Structures are given as structure tokens and as C-alpha cells.
Regions:
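Conserved alpha/beta cores of soluble small-molecule-handling proteins
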Residues: 1-91
Length: 91
């Protein structure tokens, strides 16, 4: 089993701060994107849904192209994997 690849705001890190609203209140939304041979599946559809979910919760979302680049980075390294994108309000 390989270790997970974790990016927080595009930076490799072990996780989110304990003061993050997702930890304290469960405040956030996510998308899970399957990748096959390092290629994420239907990224645009997933990002559309993520943006709708975040808007419904009034959560700030990083630039779409930036999120897509992070997804591609993780998928390329992970190969056949699941890429989970989580949006929170932050600390």
C-alpha cells in the first residue's frame, strides 16, 4: 500500500490545522475524482459540482485552473487512484 499524497493549498503537507472549520464544525465540501493511469476522469464535471456545493455553503474556492492543476499533479503521481478535493472555510 502506498502512502497518501496530501496537498493543502497546493503545498505538500501532512494535513490541515486542528483549528480548521472542517475539523471543528464539519464545515466543508468535497469531490472524489477517479484517475486511471494518471489521468483524472471527467475533471470539469467534478469541478462544476464542487463549485456548486461550495457556493451553496458560501465557501471560498481557489481558482478552477489551479485546482485542476493540483488534481493532475496528484493523479499523475498516483496512477490508478482516487483524488479527493476538499474545500473548507479555513481556520
Amino acid at each position: 500500500m502506498s502512502l497518501p499524497i496530501v496537498l493543502v493549498d497546493g503545498e505538500r503537507t501532512a494535513g490541515v490545522p486542528a483549528t480548521d472549520s472542517s475539523v471543528l464544525r464539519g464545515d466543508g465540501c468535497f469531490e472524489a475524482i477517479r484517475a486511471y493511469a494518471g489521468k483524472p476522469f471527467r475533471v470539469d464535471a467534478h469541478l462544476d459540482r464542487l463549485e456548486r456545493s461550495a457556493a451553496a455553503l458560501d465557501l471560498p474556492v481557489p481558482d478552477r485552473s489551479l485546482i485542476a492543476s493540483w488534481i493532475r499533479e496528484v493523479a499523475e503521481e498516483g496512477g490508478d487512484c482516487l483524488v479527493r478535493v476538499v474545500v473548507t472555510r479555513g481556520p
